[in-house]
Amino acid sequence: MKLDILAFGAHPDDVELGCSGTIAKEVSLGKKVGIIDLTRGELGTRGSVEIRDQEAALAAEILGISVRENLNMRDGFFVNDEAHQLEIIKRIRKYQPEIVICNAIEDRHIDHGKGSKLVSDACFLSGLRKIETEHEGVQQEVWRPKVVYHYIQWKNIEPDFVVDISEFMDIKTKSILAYASQFYSENSNEPITPIATKNFVQSIHYRTQDFGRLIGVDYAEGFTTERYVAVKSLGDLI
């Protein structure tokens, strides 16, 4: 299956928190979008691997994406080496996305920066013909995405561009709340974590509101790029 956009997250819920409004918008425009989670979040303080698997499946259904995979890398301990790069390369060649979106370049959680660099490096390597990979016994064609973008997570990073998600904020919120084990609930006996504080989900709204304010819309998501953003004409900019 060829995808238009492939989004990566170090953990289940990274993509939802960072760019699910943009994903929902692209799906509504007829684009085929997939999500690949690097780990199952097994080191997370709250919930369990099994619960998070179920939550990820529910979030995927809410977003209407075409495919979701988990690479089962070690939470907290995966590294940017040949073995891990090859796992990413195989998926890039399998789905042949034009656009790849991945974790923030740097962030509070060490896996976010690591995952970002791992995916970015794999996107480049995936275009090298002398790196040979197979899928279901068939040699894969080389493929390099046209662009790699990074969503913004815990740290307040200055975006290179923002996407208007005003009509999709409700879907973004629903996809985030699909991960009920990870966020604040009065009925939960689980420990409080940085993302399980009472106001965390509200802070996501505030950020999207602020990005939206800067471009004159209700809600927006910010991204950073690895190269200049090109437009065909000034009319493409709003």
Give the residues covered by each predicted segment.
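Metal-dependent de-N-acetylase/amidase catalytic core
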Residues: 2-6, 82-238
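Active-site rim/loop-helix segments in enzyme catalytic domains that contact anionic ligands
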Residues: 1-95, 224, 235-236
